[in-house]
Amino acid sequence: MGHSAKDEAPVVALPKLGSIFTKLLRDLKYRTPQHKDTRPALEAAMLEYAVRSGAPYESEYAQRYFDVGLTLACAYYPTHSFAVKLHIAIYSWLAIYIDDDDDGNEDLIGFQERFQKGEPQPSALLQRFAENLQEMSIHFEPLVANFIVLSSLQFVAATLLERRSELHSLQHCKEAKRWPDYVRDRSGVPEAFAYFIFPRDECPDIGAYMQGIPDMMTYINYANDILSFHKETLAGETDNYINTRAVCEQREPFAMLEIVIAETIAANSRVVGLLDTRSDPVYARKWNEFFNGYIFFHVTARRYKLHVYTGLADVGTKWQEVFAG
């Protein structure tokens, strides 16, 4: 999952990436978000939920997952109602925990079967996640809630897949060109985060935005992959999306990065063009808030280590304390 909280690489700037990132933000027409700070109230509500429900939050790692969920909900969905924002924050916190919880692999293997049968889960983490999925239709149109749940179940399957020895022994090749996107669309949960942009009470017409979901998913995946590339390169990671796709397409990683950037910009342009044709401006506004908040989260969050690039470190300075995740 793109927001995994494991990050221990040393911090140095890579000059070539600095110019690439600066150009990306310029070409995307990124604007620093400026919204009312709801973080303290949301954090208090999440803590109350954790105490009441038994959801894990007291360990150092659990607190980091908690904070990422809190931070991204504030950044991505700033004008959502408090109840919707809280639901998304809890979902994100628990999903990120599941993604990093290698020790819970045996329990996770049976998650989907138990979920489908309505059986209790063996841990507080998985039980709370199952309950969160079951309550999606409170905040989202029933069909949309179904898509969110299905995307989340695919995320669980992809998490298990990424831990399988068979996956790690695969030799990437040009004959499996679509494999990187297949895995990414499932492991990153982009469909759920795209649908989260449009809660039922504010965005009741699913026809107004449904056609844009595939491009929103592309933006969500690729922008994360681009802005994670710095810390992953420093850590020596070669199993990320950019490097895997580069092998499949027989390109150099930096050349692949440039292509993915162009595809990201094009995907956003199509979404903006589509939503701008709608008579109700709320759909375009909601996307614009998410689009800018998504970049802001990555640029200012400590774990992405992008503060080493002068052109990016100054972006969002005014609001950095609010979204310090």
Curated annotation (Swiss-Prot):
InterPro entries with a match to the protein in the record: Isoprenoid_synthase_dom_sf (IPR008949), Trichodiene_synth (IPR024652)
Cofactor requirement: Mg(2+)
GO molecular function: carbon-oxygen lyase activity, acting on phosphates; metal ion binding
SUPFAM superfamilies: Terpenoid synthases
Keyword Cytoplasm: no
Residues annotated as binding Mg(2+) 1: D99, E162
Pfam families named in the record: TRI5
Similarity comment: Belongs to the trichodiene synthase family.
Domain notes: The conserved DDXXD and NSE/DTE motifs are important for the catalytic activity, presumably through binding to Mg(2+).
Protein name, as recorded: Terpene synthase BipA
Source organism per UniProt: Cochliobolus sativus
